[in-house]
Design a protein with these regions (language model features):
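Accessory recognition modules or surfaces
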Residues: 60-67, 74-75, 109-135
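Flexible, glycine-/basic-rich loop-and-beta segments that form/coincide
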Residues: 124-152
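N-terminal, charge-rich interaction modules
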Residues: 1-31
Length: 152
């Protein structure tokens, strides 16, 4: 499971990062990461994996977002609706703390029967967001032709 999960999350050999709020059922995964040199105490990381069940847990992970290298991998791992684990968040709700700092969900992966992971990325690095911003700027700066109101 360990190497398959890393592959799903695009974590490659040589990358280092943080694993936060690890539940007991993932202690073996945590040990695997530590023994294979994936976990670092440095403030410069390639990835952050954060287990969350509510917005407070998400907020506790935010300081580590700022440790990510340019376009580092940010994964929030949360209980699936089908699991018996209690959670105040789902793939569609509860991510406001990350939205407030300019991050948006871009991918989802199944971790196991009970957990799923959402990948977040800075909106400044998402191509569709850049296109929308360019279009908005173009429309906002457009001055209608005052001589002919039918021409935009």
């Amino acid at each position: 499971m360990n190497s398959n999960l890393l592959k799903k999350m695009k974590i490659k050999e040589g990358m280092v990062g943080k694993l936060l709020n690890t539940p007991p059922e993932f202690e073996e995964f945590e040990r695997y990461l530590q023994e294979n040199g994936y976990i670092t105490s440095s403030n410069e990381t390639d990835f952050t994996l954060c287990f969350v069940t509510n917005e407070d847990k998400i907020s506790s992970c935010i300081p580590y977002v700022y440790d990510l290298n340019f376009d580092g991998l940010l994964w929030m791992i949360f209980p699936k609706k089908s699991s018996k684990l209690h959670s105040a968040i789902s793939k569609d709700k509860g991510w406001e703390p990350l939205h407030e700092i300019g991050y948006k969900e871009i991918a989802i992966a199944s971790v196991d029967d009970n957990w799923a992971a959402l990948r977040f990325r800075s909106t400044s690095l998402i191509k569709s967001a850049k296109r929308k911003l360019k279009l908005f700027d173009k429309v906002a700066n457009h001055r209608p032709n005052r001589l002919n109101p039918n021409i935009l």
